[in-house]
Each structure stands twice: as C-alpha cells, then as structure tokens.
Amino acid sequence: MDFLVYINRLLLGLVFSIFFGSGATLAGVEEDYAIAKQSFDSGDYKTAMAAWAPLAEEGHSRSQVMLGYAYKNGMGVVKNNKTSFRWYAKAAAQGDSYAQFKVGSAYTNGEVVLGNNQTAVKWFNLAAKQGFGNAQYMLAVNYYNGRGVGKDYKRAYMWCTLALHNGTRLASNIKGQIVKRLLSYHPKDGWHDESAALSEAQEMARVCLASNYQTC
C-alpha cells in the first residue's frame, strides 16, 4: 500500500466521520484537514502545512502524518528527517498504521534512531494487524531472514500472502523463495511430508485473514 492509497482510504473515512461523527467540533477539524489536503494536492504545500501544524499540535493524527511526510520530502518546509520522525512517532502512538510502518522503517534502516530490528518488528506488527500491506511485507522479510524475530518460513509465507492480498506487489519478489524453503523443510525429528509445511502456512494465512489479522 503506497502513500496515495493510504490517504485516499483516510479521506473515505473522513466523509463518514463528518456525517456520522461526534459533533460539530469533529466535523470542523476534519473539514480543516480536508481543505488543507486540497491545497497540498494542488501543490500549495506551504498553505497546507500552515493549516495542518495547529491540528497536529492538538493531536490530530492524520495531520501529524502529513507533517511527517512533508518534512521527510521537503514539501512546503525545509527537509528534516528528525522532525519527520517526531511527527510520525506521535501519529504511530495514536494507532495510525502508515505512521507505524514509517517508524518501523526508521528502526530498520537506523535512520534518525539507532537501528533495532526487534523494535522495528514491533511497529510493523502493529501496522500489519491493521491490514497495512507494506508492513506485512516487511514482517515476511524479517521472518524469512530471522531479523528481529526467529526465522520462521511459515510465518514469512503467511505475511507475504497477506501483503499481496492487500496490494503490495513487492511481496511477489520473495514469495517464490519462501515456497522453495517450505517445500524443502525437514524438522530435526525426522522425515516430513514436503508439502505439509506449505499447506500449514497456507492455512495460517487463511485463518489470519478470516480473523481480520487478530489471530496472526
């Protein structure tokens, strides 16, 4: 899931928030956010930033995400990775899946913060359980390589399958490698049906999706 897809989904939720939300205050904040988004989309980044900044300071998570994105890319403000991370971290703490993915990525790459694969996995897991495909892909990579978690090809397959389900095409690059590993899997306690591990991984993916990612 890329940033534009994420934003479009949020805007769909915004419509429901305004019409079915809890009062005029919510509608006013969301309206201000939407107007700023229109400015941003038209290339007037400074106007958008001026509108989002007070909303973000008041704790509006989507505005915090947009500030994180703008500071990361130098759109309407001077590029500043530290400030970008700070805003992403604030939104991530409020449960925003895109922000959680970005925080996890920062810990993976050692950008702004010290690299820490275990912390990265924690944030990817939070985003993945909200159906965020890129985070699901990163979990697949981490389980495949045993980075921040124990190496687990079944869980790597599960998250890779779910990432593809949610439109993260990049996951197709490693799915074949994971399947190859599963088909050659033999536990230490003796002979094992070569197709059993793959079947188990497929069932894990099915159950995870059916539970809306809550039993993964």
What are these regions (language model features)?
Residues 11-22:
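Bacterial N-terminal signal peptides
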Residues 171-216:
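Terminal, low-structured helical/coil segments at or just beyond the last alpha-helical repeat
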Residues 54-55, 90-91, 126-127, 163:
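Canonical positions in the second alpha-helix
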Residues 32-39, 51-55, 66-73, 102-109, ...:
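Hydrophobic face of amphipathic alpha-helices that form TPR/SEL1-like repeat modules
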Residues 2-12:
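Bacterial N-terminal signal peptides that target proteins for export
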